[in-house]
């Protein structure tokens, strides 16, 4: 007991001393061993530290614990401290985070326990504070000698202090589930010559996913609290024996310890390891010198595993953001301000340096599993002043132990950073030439790294930028040596060689004068491109404003913090190099997962901030939309030159883009803009524009590309013209053509292309014409299934000679269409298309579907000839010599090959059997089936066709459906060359006539006949003007330009064309016997026209429709297609190139109203032939028609001759006899024809004429004679007389009633004969009217023009030429009770130019008898009014006559008009009355008349 007492007293004395230190205030006697002497030793076991007094910035220390702590004190002053198992638990202070992590802490169990124990802790804290105040007062009253002795003891102890700790761990509670652990295996502190040396080993940072594990070490908290309250605290020594603060605060610590989280070893992820750390510093020598200075840190190797940080990345970013927010105010402190530092430098005020240097041998950054970045020999040194210098000697980039980063050998470090003492700016240098090799494997890993940490980088950049806004950013100047980036591919490598780079952070990120692009093949390097003056700039405050455009080509502003500007980009390489690079790039990109498996995740519909910017420009305020972008790249000029294209047969190609902008908005939508794009061909010093500007405003872009992160890309093109020359097809090498034919199925990616005011220019193969397709607006959609094209309108223009094309104006012609712009260049508009839809299906067999709502073609004879020849010449015909088309030489036949050696050997004859050898056949009970038409010719033909074998695999299907087609034929001539040739021919004839030479008719362009003048009065030019424009001119000039209105209109409805193309391949030669019945089908074509009409619009013709469908009596029946054509192009011998045509044509019954002038116009129109457009082939080929079948065609023909060519009669043209007779409803039938072996279409015309003409003259003469106008009434009367007998007989045979049958026959007779009598009367009255009008014309009257008298109506200052209509006097009292005011009831019919169209007397017939009477009264009154007007004018002239001779002349002129005009009125009134009477009993005749004759209403609409 006596030995125990001193030891117990020692413990309590030491315990009293330790309890005065707050950290060890929880030490208990059970955990303390004391041994005092010359080598005093103190041992502590399992000590829970009182950490509530530890104050760390932004961190709460929850608990602390030491498993073992040994303290050795020697009399000589040595102090040795060793320990093991030191553990601290920390967490961020409350509200440290401003995100969801702080809410987790707010709702945690720890917060609840702390709030619950707050009241218990307040009383204890108060008591302890009172004792500490008393103790401080006692200490303060101690003498100063004690202070001196204490300081001396501490100085001796600190001077010989040694520390060694093992297994040190800091647990940082990031959240209730994640714990970050920082462990150190060993720490050793030694003091040598007043220098402290700290060695640390086995440093490791890890994190774990944990669960709550509350401790239960203190259970009797209530009793401890009660004991604490009843304890006498007067004597502190006694209280130290019987009382421990750990017991009083057990409830508080139990709540804190409940936050210690437990985790298994499998859940721990190591993110950082440090091999060895050596720290040397000075300071901490006495109680008055506790500062640390001259610190040098040496680290052997650091390994950072970036991939393993991903689970706690969110927590680390939150800590970083919170730390920046809480320390951002430090930048405004006086000692951190730049002005204060400058003041220190000027006043030579030096601060004591704490950190001197940090030296790291190696830092290994493990970016991914196999991707590693090593930094070797890193040095950070504090220089005299305010900045730090740094250097990195070398760098290595490794992937799977393969090195990708190389630098030139040098003794200098790779990176170095030096401070600028004068400007307090930093300068960083890259002291070596470096090379970075990138292959697809490494790029895949880098893209994975960017994808994984891109969002984190953007977040860090965002929060650091927000922090930097509150203080002035430091300036860092960077300068490098040459940098080479090498992209390794399969067969080649691409190298980017950069000149020294400069940058001034944070404003200028990248600045290089030149970047060279080299192609490496083996040991050979070729320069293929250069980039000049690339500058990348950034702004920490504010944004760059870049003028750009949206997809509607409207001006916008792009606001961005990062902007790159490239002065020029120029690539120059050959086609072979381009193909090599393209193939390698395609393979390279195909091996990258980001390209083969693009990220299709939708990032949500983020709303990009859009605002309006008010700009003041030219005293006008306008709004401009603005958008935010992550970056903007501006390229002033980009150019690419491809040399030696198509084996140097095509020349060089130059692609040029000016003022390009590339940007990416916050939705990751990539937008590219090109203001001006051009593609040129250079061959033999001649430049040809392939893609060029067509009437486009240069202030707006021509190309806009939008590529969203999710969704289809969209390309917008405006004002671009594409030029294609058909001759370029010959420049393609034969090997390439074979590759094109064998090309596999095309695949398209989803994309939308919109065209605005674009055009396609086509130049044919042999002739010099030019065709332009103008596209005002179009939408093209690409998809894996095919292509869809839709547009509202399209226009085709043509020029006859590209050599006379006017030079394009550089100035933009505003407010005009693209078609008008081309017309100013010399083109003529010919075709206009409305609402077109085209679909290209990407299947095994190519399918094209085209739907068009309306096609309007307006042509003259010369422009139609040029258009057809141009369309044929766009794809040159493939012609072959006869040796390839036909088998000229017979094949050698081995006649002995088919001889049978046993031919003469006697064999058993089956016919030699006897009667017994035959069996009796069974008797069949079935009936005999007779096959009809067994011997029919048609059936034999079908069988013959079926006997042949053919293989037709469809490779191409084209379907075209046009709802409405209009072909307008204009008189006159479009091309200047045509007009010039005609004028020259006329001038030559006129000169020869004036010289008295013998003249004959001249023919120009195979269709224009110029007759020789008969006398000096006749003027050829006036005759031509009268024929073309139907007008009289005395100017002496020829008017050969196209007429204002068309002469003939060909109108079709529902035109359907279906084309099926097969394999166009020459088969291998086979034996003659095996291939005698084989043939190859190249293509099938099916054409169907539902309705077809030809409208006659010649001024000299009174008829309306030249051709139309015959009306059927069955109105309920569905009308078939008017024209159906089925054609097949075959190759009869598969191994030869000769082709033949098989055609079948079906035509419905037709009605023709043929006027001789119209027939002559159509004949000459389609006969026009210009030698400039003649297509000459090397081997001319005439289409051979193997078989042609035309079904029987029924015609209802009306023919009106105008003149007779007597010269043709004399020469033997018997067809001229037709011009002596007028035909009215002649019924003609063209019989069914099947032709074989027709050599071309010219021969076909002759053969058909030789077949149909004799058949008509032999079998259909009676029908034609009955249609002659003089015999038409007699034929009608004879039909009525025949019906008087035939009709009763037929009815009597049917019902046996004689009375009713006789009555029916009488009705038919009366109707037929009555109608014919009325028609005859109408013809007589109309003929009489015509004779009277012609007589009046000869005597000086108005004649036919008197039907519509020209007058002048004055309205204000305008004079309108008009015509008096037949409804002039509708305000008369007989039909209208309103007051008579003729001037207000004039129906104005405008003239067609300077001439009037002639209307037939049979046009505009009244529908019934009452209408006939009304029209008769109006015509009579009109003619009487004209007579009265003529008499009134004659009376005025008589008054003004100067003599009797003049008066007699006036009366002689007026007398014929006064006498004949009333007779004309009478005949016209009688004709109208009879027409109304006839039409009342024949309602279908009105529709026939409207189709046959022109009307005044139709003339107004044309």
UniProtKB/Swiss-Prot annotation:
GO molecular function, one term: protein-membrane adaptor activity
Chief location category: membrane
Compositionally skewed regions (Polar residues) per UniProt: 211-222
Biased composition (Acidic residues): 223-234
Role according to the record: Lipid transfer protein required for autophagosome completion and peroxisome degradation. Tethers the edge of the isolation membrane (IM) to the endoplasmic reticulum (ER) and mediates direct lipid transfer from ER to IM for IM expansion. ATG2 binds to the ER exit site (ERES), which is the membrane source for autophagosome formation, using basic residues in its N-terminal region (NR) and to the expanding edge of the IM through its C-terminal region. The latter binding is assisted by an ATG18-PtdIns3P interaction.
Keyword terms, alphabetized: Autophagy, Endoplasmic reticulum, Lipid transport, Membrane, Protein transport, Transport
Chain intervals for the UniProt region annotation (Disordered): 211-234
Entry keyword annotation includes Transport: yes
Name of the protein described by the UniProt record: Autophagy-related protein 2
Example GO BP: lipid transport
Annotated family: Belongs to the ATG2 family.
Encoding gene per record: ATG2
Domain of life: Eukaryota
Gene Ontology CC, one term: endoplasmic reticulum membrane
InterPro entries linked: ATG2
Originating organism: Kluyveromyces lactis (strain ATCC 8585 / CBS 2359 / DSM 70799 / NBRC 1267 / NRRL Y-1140 / WM37) (Yeast)
Catalytic activities: a 1,2-diacyl-sn-glycero-3-phosphocholine(in) = a 1,2-diacyl-sn-glycero-3-phosphocholine(out); a 1,2-diacyl-sn-glycero-3-phospho-L-serine(in) = a 1,2-diacyl-sn-glycero-3-phospho-L-serine(out); a 1,2-diacyl-sn-glycero-3-phosphoethanolamine(in) = a 1,2-diacyl-sn-glycero-3-phosphoethanolamine(out)
Topology within the bilayer: Peripheral membrane protein
């Amino acid at each position: 007991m006596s030995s125990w007492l001193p030891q117990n007293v020692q413990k309590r004395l030491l315990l009293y001393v330790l309890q005065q230190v707050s950290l060890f205030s929880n030490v208990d006697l059970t955990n303390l061993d004391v041994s005092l002497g010359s080598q005093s030793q103190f041992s502590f076991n399992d000590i829970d530290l009182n950490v509530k007094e530890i104050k760390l910035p932004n961190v709460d220390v929850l608990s602390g614990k030491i498993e073992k702590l040994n303290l050795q004190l020697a009399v000589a002053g040595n102090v040795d401290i060793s320990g093991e198992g030191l553990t601290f638990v920390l967490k961020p202070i409350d509200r440290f985070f401003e995100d969801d992590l702080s809410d987790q802490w707010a709702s945690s169990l720890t917060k609840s326990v702390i709030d619950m124990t707050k009241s218990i802790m307040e009383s204890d804290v108060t008591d302890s504070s009172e004792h500490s105040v008393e103790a401080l007062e006692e200490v303060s009253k101690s003498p100063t000698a004690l202070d001196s002795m204490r300081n001396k003891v501490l100085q001796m102890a600190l001077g010989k202090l040694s520390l060694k700790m093992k297994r040190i761990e800091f647990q940082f509670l990031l959240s209730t589930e994640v714990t970050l652990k920082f462990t150190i295996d060993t720490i050793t502190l030694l003091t040598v010559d007043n220098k402290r040396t700290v060695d640390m080993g086995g440093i490791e940072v890890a994190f774990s996913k944990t669960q709550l594990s509350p401790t239960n070490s203190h259970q009797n908290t209530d009793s401890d609290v009660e004991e604490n309250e009843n304890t006498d605290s007067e004597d502190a020594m006694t209280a130290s024996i019987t009382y421990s603060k750990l017991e009083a605060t057990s409830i508080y610590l139990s709540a804190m310890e409940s936050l210690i989280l437990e985790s298994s070893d499998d859940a721990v992820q190591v993110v950082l390891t440090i091999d060895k750390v050596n720290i040397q510093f000075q300071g901490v020598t006495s109680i008055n010198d506790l500062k640390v200075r001259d610190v040098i840190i040496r680290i052997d190797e650091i390994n950072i595993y970036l991939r393993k940080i991903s689970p706690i990345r969110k927590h680390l970013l939150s800590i970083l953001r919170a730390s920046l927010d809480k320390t951002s105010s430090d930048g405004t402190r006086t000692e951190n301000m730049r002005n204060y530092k400058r003041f220190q430098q000027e006043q030579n005020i030096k601060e004591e340096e704490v950190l001197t240097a940090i030296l790291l041998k190696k830092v290994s950054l493990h970016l991914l599993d196999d991707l590693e970045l090593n930094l070797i020999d890193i040095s950070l040194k504090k220089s005299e002043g305010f900045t730090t210098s740094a250097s990195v000697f070398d760098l290595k980039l490794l992937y799977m132990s393969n090195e990708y980063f190389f630098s030139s050998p040098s003794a200098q470090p790779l990176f170095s950073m030096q401070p600028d003492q004068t400007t307090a700016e930093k300068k960083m240098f890259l002291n070596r030439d470096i090379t970075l090799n990138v292959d697809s494997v490494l790029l895949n890993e880098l893209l994975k790294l960017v994808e994984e940490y891109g969002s984190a980088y953007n977040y860090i950049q965002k929060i650091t930028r927000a922090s930097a806004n509150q203080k002035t950013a430091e300036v860092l100047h960077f300068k490098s040596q040459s940098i080479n980036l090498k992209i390794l591919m399969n067969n080649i490598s691409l190298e980017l060689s950069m000149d020294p780079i400069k940058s001034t952070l944070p404003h200028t990120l990248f600045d290089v004068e030149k970047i060279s692009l080299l192609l490496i093949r083996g040991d050979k390097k070729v320069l293929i491109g250069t980039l000049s003056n690339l500058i990348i700039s950034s702004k920490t405050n504010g944004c760059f404003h870049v003028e750009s455009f949206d997809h509607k080509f409207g001006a916008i502003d792009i606001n961005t913090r990062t902007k790159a500007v490239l002065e020029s980009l120029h690539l120059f390489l050959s086609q072979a190099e381009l193909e090599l690079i393209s193939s390698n790039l395609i393979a390279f990109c195909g091996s990258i997962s980001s390209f083969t498996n693009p990220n299709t995740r939708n990032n949500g519909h983020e709303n990009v901030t859009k605002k309006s910017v008010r700009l003041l420009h030219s005293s006008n305020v306008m709004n401009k939309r603005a958008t935010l972008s992550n970056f903007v790249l501006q390229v002033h000029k980009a150019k690419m030159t491809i040399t030696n294209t198509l084996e140097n047969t095509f020349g060089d190609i130059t692609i040029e883009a000016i003022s390009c902008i590339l940007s990416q908005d916050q939705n990751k939508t990539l937008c590219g803009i090109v203001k001006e794009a051009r593609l040129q061909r250079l061959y033999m010093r001649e430049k040809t524009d392939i893609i060029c500007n067509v009437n486009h405003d240069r202030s707006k872009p021509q190309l806009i590309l939008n590529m969203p992160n999710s969704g289809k890309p969209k390309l917008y093109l405006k004002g671009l013209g594409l030029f294609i020359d058909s001759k370029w097809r010959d420049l393609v090498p034969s090997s390439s053509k074979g590759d094109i034919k064998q090309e596999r199925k095309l695949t398209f990616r989803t994309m939308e292309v919109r065209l605005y005011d674009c055009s396609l220019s086509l130049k044919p193969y042999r002739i010099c014409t030019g065709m332009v397709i103008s596209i005002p607006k179009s939408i093209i959609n690409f998809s894996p299934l095919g292509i869809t094209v839709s547009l509202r309108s399209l226009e085709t223009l043509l020029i006859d000679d590209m050599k006379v094309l006017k030079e394009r104006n550089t100035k933009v012609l505003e407010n005009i269409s693209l078609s008008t712009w081309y017309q100013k260049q010399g083109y003529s508009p010919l075709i206009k298309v409305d609402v077109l839809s085209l679909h290209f299906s990407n299947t095994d067999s190519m399918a094209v579907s085209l739907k068009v709502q309306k096609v309007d073609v307006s042509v003259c004879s010369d422009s139609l000839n040029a258009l057809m020849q141009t369309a044929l010449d766009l794809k040159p015909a493939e012609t072959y010599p006869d040796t390839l088309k036909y088998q000229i030489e017979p094949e050698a036949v081995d006649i002995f090959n088919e001889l049978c050696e046993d031919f003469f050997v006697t064999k058993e004859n089956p016919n030699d059997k006897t009667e017994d050898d035959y069996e009796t056949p069974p008797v069949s009970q079935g009936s005999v089936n007779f096959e009809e038409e067994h011997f029919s010719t048609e059936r034999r033909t079908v069988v013959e066709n079926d006997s042949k074998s053919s293989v037709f695999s469809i490779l191409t299907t084209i379907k075209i459906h046009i709802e409405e087609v209009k072909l307008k034929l204009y008189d006159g001539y479009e091309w200047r060359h045509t007009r010039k040739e005609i004028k020259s021919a006329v001038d030559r004839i006129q000169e020869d006539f004036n010289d008295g030479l013998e003249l004959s008719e001249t023919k120009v362009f195979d269709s224009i006949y110029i007759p020789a003048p008969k006398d000096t009065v006749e003027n050829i030019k006036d005759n031509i003007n009268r024929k073309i424009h139907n007008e009289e001119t005395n100017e002496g000039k020829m008017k050969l330009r196209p007429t204002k209105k068309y002469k003939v209109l060909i109108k079709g409805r529902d035109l359907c064309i279906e084309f099926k193309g097969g394999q166009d391949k020459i088969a291998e030669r086979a034996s003659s016997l095996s291939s005698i019945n084989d043939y190859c089908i190249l293509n099938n074509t099916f054409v169907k026209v539902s309705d077809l009409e030809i409208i006659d619009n010649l001024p000299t013709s009174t008829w309306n429709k030249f051709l139309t469908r015959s009306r059927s009596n069955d109105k309920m029946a569905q009308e078939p297609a008017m024209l159906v054509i089925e054609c097949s192009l075959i190759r009869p011998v598969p191994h030869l190139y000769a082709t033949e045509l098989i055609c079948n044509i079906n035509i419905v019954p037709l009605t023709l109203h043929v006027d001789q002038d119209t027939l002559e116009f159509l004949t000459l129109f389609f006969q026009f032939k210009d030698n400039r457009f003649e297509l000459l082939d090397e081997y001319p080929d005439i289409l051979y028609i193997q078989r042609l079948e035309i079904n029987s065609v029924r015609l209802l023909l009306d023919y009106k001759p105008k003149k007779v060519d007597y010269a043709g009669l004399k020469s033997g043209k018997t067809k001229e006899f037709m011009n002596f007779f007028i035909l009215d409803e002649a019924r003609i039938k063209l019989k069914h024809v099947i032709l074989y072996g027709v050599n071309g279409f010219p021969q076909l015309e002759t053969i058909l004429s030789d077949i149909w003409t004799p058949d008509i003259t032999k079998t259909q003469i009676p029908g034609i004679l009955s249609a002659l106008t003089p015999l038409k009434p007699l034929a009608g009367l004879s039909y009525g007389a025949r019906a008087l007998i035939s009709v009763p007989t037929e009815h009597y045979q049917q019902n046996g009633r004689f009375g009713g049958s006789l009555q029916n026959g009488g009705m038919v007779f009366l109707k037929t004969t009555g109608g014919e009598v009325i028609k005859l009367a109408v013809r007589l009255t109309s003929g009489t009217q015509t004779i009277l009008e012609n007589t009046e014309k000869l005597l000086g009257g108005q004649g036919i023009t008197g039907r519509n008298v020209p007058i002048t109506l004055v309205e204000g200052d305008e004079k309108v030429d008009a015509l008096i209509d037949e409804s002039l006097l509708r305000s008369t009292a007989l039909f209208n009770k309103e007051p008579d005011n003729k001037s207000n009831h004039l129906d104005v019919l405008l003239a067609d130019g300077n001439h009037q169209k002639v209307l037939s007397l049979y046009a505009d017939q009244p529908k019934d008898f009452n209408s006939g009477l009304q029209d008769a009264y109006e015509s009579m009154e009109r003619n009487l009014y004209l007579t009265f007007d003529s008499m009134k004018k004659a009376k005025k002239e008589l008054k003004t006559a100067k003599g009797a001779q003049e008066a007699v002349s006036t009366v002689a002129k007026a007398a014929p008009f006064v006498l004949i005009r009333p007779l004309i009125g009478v005949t016209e009134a009688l004709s109208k009355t009879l027409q109304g009477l006839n039409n009342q009993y024949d309602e279908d005749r009105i529709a026939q008349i409207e189709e046959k004759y022109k009307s005044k209403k139709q003339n107004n609409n044309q």
